[in-house]
């Protein structure tokens, strides 16, 4: 069988999930591509047919699929549609996020034919405290394209939709996590929480002279927590700490200086590899 089109569906405030998804799509060789970007708004009653392929890529926040991504996926449905589910995490751990996305996909009428975990630069990563800086890199994107080719081969090898088998994402290989860095991280997180040190609720403009009020941060914020013309303020009730405004500010005026960045940078130096399941 063949897929007549591919639907790339992603939530990607800092563009890492988007990069991975686009590389997978390129690898499939399918030229009819329909993009659904959930970063700024939810999908509008999207039903994907059985003859198409869906690729869904979302970031991991705190070991779970980003809650806003799940909310905006709510109106996406399949009809026994083959789907590839991908989570992108910041080199710490994706925990149960892939299983969470798998459960959602099955409930929404999709058949999960492949799954993957990729690494993207952590939202809290900075030059001073890098966490998976520059990921996905060239090697990651090559692996993503190779994964796309394998997906196409799997679809082509099935004589009909009923012969295209689903996968059990619980069987995906997990990257090895050295024990002592993880133990050190958990110990320091517990100590930080017990200390009562207040944690920043939102990114902020550290040096107001750098802000030109260009409105870029307001435009890229997925939850409208920043208003153009009032860029020095961020609505803490809306902010999801994705740090799109920090990474996308052309003047480098915005910062998010959290002690978690220090811990992540110190404890997760060893770079993890993407893992795939077909």
Which role does the model predict for each range below?
Residues 175-222:
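Acidic, Ser/Thr-rich low-complexity intrinsically disordered segments
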Residues 2-7, 12-39, 45-194, 257-264, ...:
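FMN-binding flavodoxin-like domain, especially the glycine-rich phosphate-binding loop
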Residues 85-87, 193, 201-203, 229-230:
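A short, structure-level motif marking secondary-structure boundaries and short turns
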Residues 205-207, 212-240, 244-261:
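Iron-sulfur cluster-binding cysteine motifs and their immediate structural context
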